[in-house]
Amino acid sequence: MNTNMSGGRRSMPKRKVKTYQQLIQENKEAIMGNPKLMNVIYDRIDRKHQKNLQEQNNT
């Protein structure tokens, strides 16, 4: 049975998933020119760091 006919399942093309750090590296120049975006990134890094500290204190 041919699965490419209508009604059959089609596989989605796979996209490479990038990490947050990879996205920042690739867009570094644009980010550095945008103070609001830099603040968003710093806030996210701060939250992640605080979460890691809390997890270390709980263990």
UniProtKB/Swiss-Prot annotation:
Q: What InterPro entries is this protein classified in?
A: SenN/SenS (IPR025004)
User: Which domain of life does the UniProt lineage start with?
Assistant: Bacteria
Q: What's the protein name? A: Uncharacterized protein YdbN
Record organism? Bacillus subtilis (strain 168)
Q: What is the lineage of its organism?
A: Bacteria, Bacillati, Bacillota, Bacilli, Bacillales
Q: Which gene encodes it?
A: ydbN
